[in-house]
């Protein structure tokens, strides 16, 4: 009993702190044995406890771990107390799935179903794929393989097999750990050590190969604007005051610069609404572009053109876009890019946040929301975008744009590599969960795309992590972000980002190979149990 408590308690500590933003050491150790210790502890209880008790123990273990991992969601200052209900539903779903999988693992060890154990890493990938692709807009945060992102070599392993490959190898390694603790055979030790080393060896080998061939010859000169507004602060300001602050920040930019990047929904009113008067903004306008003629009323596009004219560069800015469809107003979360030649390209966010940007469940979901959470009953419908976000920044450099947590989905960003984008651009706003871990959690999930696809990235955020990262996941420049101990300050990050890119297996095949493995594994484990059941029935007949 003591060993069971020790194994389960130690596994809880390791997995809880196995977050790249919290502890690199715990993340590495967790990938090796964190879950294996849990399964060994549960296996020790099989003789003295019912399967129901074992499942409940695994459920509460997972519930508490996931509750800690998603604790940033409980910052309710802006999103309201209803977020507790959403948080509880999410971690309960995750706990049910992992507790059930853990019982399957324990059963296979207990009954010595070695053939079934072979399929289990793929089975887990299939389980995670359901929430990654099918749970509302998808839940990409905190997949089992995420602790590998704590090291450069672990992240680089994703360039072969993506998030699914990372989860696969972590489950396989921990199954090896459990077999070591159960059998203590030399073969088990060898298999476990091979699994431990495999992702770091493969990822590290390719990382060092790319690093030796890395080139800084071609760069993109970027100015990333971090306004430093929380959602509440921005809502209390007039649109003219917001622009006055943005222009003031931009005055510190030193030419030459190729592109100025602003965060998600930096200004209100969309691109073409004449919401500004020359008289009210004359002083700011003349400081930005002297001797320029302005109409009495002008738009956000006019502001952006003035910035582009002043700094002779492209400008990318997040804002909302309204569209009237059959008499009904629809809203898009958009990114607007103005090239140096004056061409405007729009990109609409394709993966929307449930609750914040749309109400799941159609009319039925809206009715429930209006009855129980009226403050979240949206008066308009926000639509997902339908087209790719490739924009031309300079004559030679194209960017692939994502908004908010779209960057955490490899399948959503993968087409940009195939469409010959040179750099990734993410516009986001983590200010809805102030003073929480979210900025770093979001950043570490997003930076995986750099090494998965072999592409650099620039991120513009209001209060989160505004940074430039090269194609090997190395931070070229970063601004301070908001945390519990550090308030955020308005600033501009001006940096030259190498646009060196390289081919990856994931960029060529995406998630398809591991999804094939996942489906095959589910069929394999079902076939295994059906075959054993058939043998059992045949034996009983004899």
Swiss-Prot record:
It is found in: Cell inner membrane. Residues 220-499 form the CN hydrolase domain. The gene is lnt. GO terms for molecular function: N-acyltransferase activity. GO terms for cellular component: plasma membrane. The active site is at residues 264, 349, 404. It is a multi-pass membrane protein. The chain crosses the membrane at residues 26-46, 54-74, 89-109, 113-133, 163-183, 187-207, 509-529. CDD domains: ALP_N-acyl_transferase (cd07571). Pathway: Protein modification; lipoprotein biosynthesis (N-acyl transfer). Catalyzes the phospholipid dependent N-acylation of the N-terminal cysteine of apolipoprotein, the last step in lipoprotein maturation. Its main location: membrane. Belongs to the CN hydrolase family. Apolipoprotein N-acyltransferase subfamily. HAMAP family: Lnt. The keyword Phosphoprotein does not apply. Keywords: Acyltransferase, Cell inner membrane, Cell membrane, Membrane, Transferase, Transmembrane, Transmembrane helix. This is Apolipoprotein N-acyltransferase. Its EC number is 2.3.1.269. GO terms for biological process: lipoprotein biosynthetic process.
